[in-house]
């Protein structure tokens, strides 16, 4: 079975990716399987730039095909913030709770109808030989004024999906993966892998 490196140490993200790619003939490895793997600086200006950088570095270092995602929250009332800085919105190595608190603070005076936002995700697939592919997904919602739900990670407890009547953190994993930005991008990746494989 072909090994595929998922360039992340985020267990929540890895769990979502594994659930969606289930059934494909790949053994998934994470960066936890490569303890000496260096930290890759996410210095791109777009989700695509960051995803391609992480996947290509992982493919080159491990000698295996690799996929990486870069995703984040884009809030209309904040001119697209936190964007590519979503994971470190309140500072380097910030916790989900700290990032959520900063977001709520910045939206404190913004009325509900103006709290529109989107989760965006770009997945990059790179081979050690230099082939590169990208797949993108998006999900629209509204930022609530307090967290709801205990599932998921990141901004999930604040991101309300109207058609589901729930936050991302309130949805079971299977339901979340069916509608999420990452789920949509991974569905495109899965289709690609099913038809073309990694090369």
From Swiss-Prot:
Keywords: Hydrolase, Magnesium, Metal-binding, Nucleotide metabolism, Nucleotide-binding. SUPFAM superfamilies: ITPase-like. Substrate binds at residues 8-13, 71, 153-156, 176, 181-182. Its EC number is 3.6.1.66. GO terms for biological process: nucleoside triphosphate catabolic process; nucleotide metabolic process; purine nucleoside triphosphate catabolic process. Binds 1 Mg(2+) ion per subunit. Mg(2+) binds at residues 41, 70. GO terms for cellular component: cytoplasm; cytosol. Its cofactor is Mg(2+). The active site is at 70 (proton acceptor). It catalyses: XTP + H2O = XMP + diphosphate + H(+); dITP + H2O = dIMP + diphosphate + H(+); ITP + H2O = IMP + diphosphate + H(+). Pfam families: Ham1p_like (PF01725). GO terms for molecular function: dITP diphosphatase activity; ITP diphosphatase activity; metal ion binding; nucleoside triphosphate diphosphatase activity; nucleotide binding; ribonucleoside triphosphate phosphatase activity; XTP diphosphatase activity. The keyword Oxidoreductase does not apply. NCBIfam families: PRK14822.1, RdgB/HAM1 family non-canonical purine NTP pyrophosphatase. Belongs to the HAM1 NTPase family. Homodimer. Pyrophosphatase that catalyzes the hydrolysis of nucleoside triphosphates to their monophosphate derivatives, with a high preference for the non-canonical purine nucleotides XTP (xanthosine triphosphate), dITP (deoxyinosine triphosphate) and ITP. Seems to function as a house-cleaning enzyme that removes non-canonical purine nucleotides from the nucleotide pool, thus preventing their incorporation into DNA/RNA and avoiding chromosomal lesions. This is dITP/XTP pyrophosphatase.
């Amino acid at each position: 079975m072909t090994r595929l490196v998922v360039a992340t140490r985020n267990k929540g993200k890895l769990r979502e990716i594994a659930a969606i790619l289930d059934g494909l003939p790949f053994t998934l490895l994470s960066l936890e399987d490569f303890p000496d793997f260096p930290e890759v600086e996410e210095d791109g200006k777009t989700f695509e730039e960051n995803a391609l950088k992480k996947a290509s570095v992982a493919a080159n270092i491990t000698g295996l095909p690799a996929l990486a995602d870069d995703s984040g929250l884009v809030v209309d009332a904040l001119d697209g913030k936190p964007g590519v800085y979503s994971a470190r919105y309140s500072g380097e190595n910030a916790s989900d709770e700290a990032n959520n608190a900063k977001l709520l603070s910045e939206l404190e005076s913004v009325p509900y109808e103006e709290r529109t936002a989107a989760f965006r995700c770009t997945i990059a697939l790179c081979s050690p030989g230099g082939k590169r592919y990208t797949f993108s997904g998006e999900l629209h919602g509204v930022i609530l004024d307090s967290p709801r739900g205990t599932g998921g990670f990141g901004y999930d407890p604040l991101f309300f999906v109207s058609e589901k009547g729930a936050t991302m953190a309130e949805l079971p994993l299977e339901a979340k993966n069916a509608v999420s930005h990452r789920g949509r991008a991974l569905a495109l990746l899965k289709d690609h892998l099913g038809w073309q494989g990694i090369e």
